[in-house]
Amino acid sequence: MDAKLLEKLDALPTEPGVYLMKDRRGQVIYVGKAINLRSRVRSYFNRTGDTRVFVSLLDQLLGDLETVLVSNEKEALLLENELIKKHRPRFNVLLKDDKQFISLRLDRTQPYPRLEVVRKYERDGARYFGPYSSAGAIRETLRVVNRFFRLRTCTDHVLANRKRPCLLHQIGRCPAPCVYPVPQEDYHRSVDEVVMFLEGKAGELVEGLRLRMKRAAQELKFEEAARIRDQLNAIERSLERQKVATTDFKDQDVFAFHREGDRILFYVLWVRQGRLNGGQAFPFGSQEFPDEELIASFVNLYYDQGSFVPEEVLLPLELEDGTGGLEALLTERKGERVRVLVPKRGEKLDLVKMAAKNAEQAFVERRRTKDETDTVLSRLQQRLGLRNFPCRMECFDISHFQGSAIVASQVAVTDGDADKSRYRKYKIKTLEKQDDFASMYEVISRRLKKGLEDNDLPDLLVIDGGKGQLASAHAAMKDVGVESVDVVGLAKSRDLEVFDRDAESARSPERIFVVGRKDPIVLSQNSAEMFMLTRMRDEAHRFAITFQKQVLRKSRVRSALEDIPGVGETRRKQLLRHFGSLKRVGDASIEELAEVVGPAMAERVHAGLHGHPEEDAEDPVREASLDDAHEPVDEKTQGGSPPGAA
C-alpha cells in the first residue's frame, strides 16, 4: 500500500459516514457505511488470519479511499444506498430493479374503488396487500375477489366513459357503476369485505356473511343466499391454505441467509396478519464482506426499491452498528413506528429459523442448477472455440415491415437466465430504406460504444443471421475497437437437397457461423447448448417484432391524424393529452372523441383513423419467450453511428 493511502487511513475521522473504496483505475469497488469510519475501515487491515479473498487482495486492489461525513446513521444508510445505486460496485450486494414484487392496491378514497396489480408501494394513502410470491398466487386471489365480492375491474378512464355495461355485469360479477347509479354504501360494504378477506380476518368476515345469508333466506331471496353460501365456501377454502405463523397477527418481514464461500443467498419470508404469505430468494456471488455488513446493506436496498414496510422486521443476527439507524430509516419510510428485532426465543425465532431453512434449500437448488448451466456453457465454449466463457450473452435481431419501421432488439442472458434489465430496443437512425446488414452494423456499433463508456461488455454476441449479418457485426466491432468479445451468427439451413420443405415433420437444422471459419458449425438439434441459443434467438425475434408493431402503429396513427382535414397541431395535442397515447386515440369511440373535439370533428377523426387499418394479423413465425411473464422494458437507445462496410 502506498504512503498516500496509509496517510488517509491514519487520518480517518471517528464520526459516522460513508466510505468508497476505489481500485487503481479510480473505479468504485465497494461502498460501506459506519458509525465510526476509522474503526470500520481500519478493521479490514487489522484482521490477521482472515482468509477472505477480498481482504487478502485488498492491498493490491485498493488504489484510493474516499469518505463522506454525515450527521447520523440514518443519513449514512440513505447515502450508502444512493452511492451503491450510482456506482454499482462489484463487491456490494446489488439488487436488480426489475419490479419483481407483485402486490394489490386499493384506493378507498375513490367513489367506486377497484383492486389494481402493482409492483411498487407508494405513500399515497391507498391500501396495499402483499407482496405475492408469484403471478399465479395473485391471479388466484383476484379470481376469488372478482367472482364473489363484485368490485369493478375496469380502469378509471373506462369507468368515466363507458356507455353500456360490460360482460362481467351480465354474468353477475360487477354492479356496473360505470352505467348504473350503484349506491356507494352498498359498494363500500363489499370493499370492506374485500379488505377483511385480504387481511386474513376470517372470523369477522365469515360471521358477517353468515348473518347476511340467513337474512336473505328469511326474506326468501334464495338466489342471493346461494351466492353468499358459495362466497363463504370459497373464502374458507382460501384461508385453509394459509398457515398461521404467529398469534399476534402482525405484518412481518423475516430475513435470513445461507452462505458458502463468497456466494450468499438472502431469503425474505413474508408474514401478513400472522399468516405466511410466501417468500423470495435473492442469490449473490463475489460477496467477501462480513455477514453483518451484507445483511444491513441488503435490507436497506430491499426497502428502497419500493417494497412494503411492515410493522416488524426480523433479522438473523445483530448488526455491527446496531439496529437503531435502520429502525429510524424504515419508520420514516413507512410513516409510523417500525421495530427491527433480532429474536432470541419464541415464535419470532421460529420464523427466523424457518426463513433460514428456506434460504439453505434455495441455495442448494440454485447451486445444482448453476452447476448444470455451467456445464452447458462450458460445452458451448468448447464446441464454438470461444475465447471467453459465455457467462453473459446478448442476441440481436433486426425487424421491419415492408422496409418501414426498421427496429432492432437486444436480449440478454446471464448464467443461462433471461436478464431483462439488459434488454434494449433500438430504432434505426441512419437508414431510410431496408438494409439488414447496415442496420446490424449500426446497432452493434451503438451497443459497443455505450459498453465501452460504461465498462459493460458481454462475453458473447449472438447475431440472428448468417455470414452477411455476422460480417457486418464483426466490422462494427473492429471499427469501434472491441476485440475482447466473441461473436457468432445463428441461422437456419436452406439446403433443399437435404431437407424437404414440404414435409410436415421436416425441420432445418440451425447453423452457427464463426468469424474466420468457412463452414458453419452444426450442433445436435436436441442438445442443451443448441436449445439455449435458439431460445435466446427466438426471444430476440419476439422482442423485435413486438417493438416493430408498436412503432408501426404509432407512425400510422400519427400519419392518419395529420391527414385528416381540420385536425391541426392544437387538436392533435388535445387528443393526445386527453387519451394519453396514440393507441388510445385510435381505440376511442366516436362518443369518446366527441367529448374532446365535438361531434362533427369526432366523426371525421374516427373515419380518418379507421381508414388506416392496422396490421394485426398474427405473425406466421411462432414466437417463443424466455419468460411468459415478460413485460416490455422502456426504450433505451444510445447515440447513433454511421454504417460502415456491411
Curated annotation (Swiss-Prot):
Q: What is the superkingdom listed in this entry's lineage?
A: Bacteria
Q: Does the keyword Cytoplasm apply?
A: yes
Q: Which Gene3D superfamilies match?
A: 5' to 3' exonuclease, C-terminal subdomain, GIY-YIG endonuclease, UVR domain, UvrC, RNAse H endonuclease domain
**Primary location:** cytoplasm
Per the record, its GO cellular-component terms are:
cytoplasm; excinuclease repair complex
Q: Which residues form the UVR domain?
A: 203-238
Where is this protein localized, as stated in its record?
Cytoplasm
Specify where the region named Disordered lies, as residue ranges: 604-646
CDD domains given in the database record: GIY-YIG_UvrC_Cho
One Pfam family assigned to this protein is: UvrC_RNaseH
Picking any one GO biological process from the record gives: nucleotide-excision repair
Query: Domain GIY-YIG, which positions?
Result: 14-93
- Tell me which UniProt keywords the record has, alphabetically: Cytoplasm, DNA damage, DNA excision, DNA repair, Excision nuclease, SOS response
Q: Where is the composition biased (Basic and acidic residues)?
A: 604-637
| SMART domains named in the record | GIYc
Please give the Gene Ontology molecular function terms for this protein: DNA binding; excinuclease ABC activity
DNA repair is among the record's keywords: yes
Its function?
The UvrABC repair system catalyzes the recognition and processing of DNA lesions. UvrC both incises the 5' and 3' sides of the lesion. The N-terminal half is responsible for the 3' incision and the C-terminal half is responsible for the 5' incision.
Assembly and oligomerization: Interacts with UvrB in an incision complex.
Q: Which family does it belong to?
A: Belongs to the UvrC family.
What is the name attached to this protein's record?
Answer: UvrABC system protein C
- Identify the coding gene: uvrC
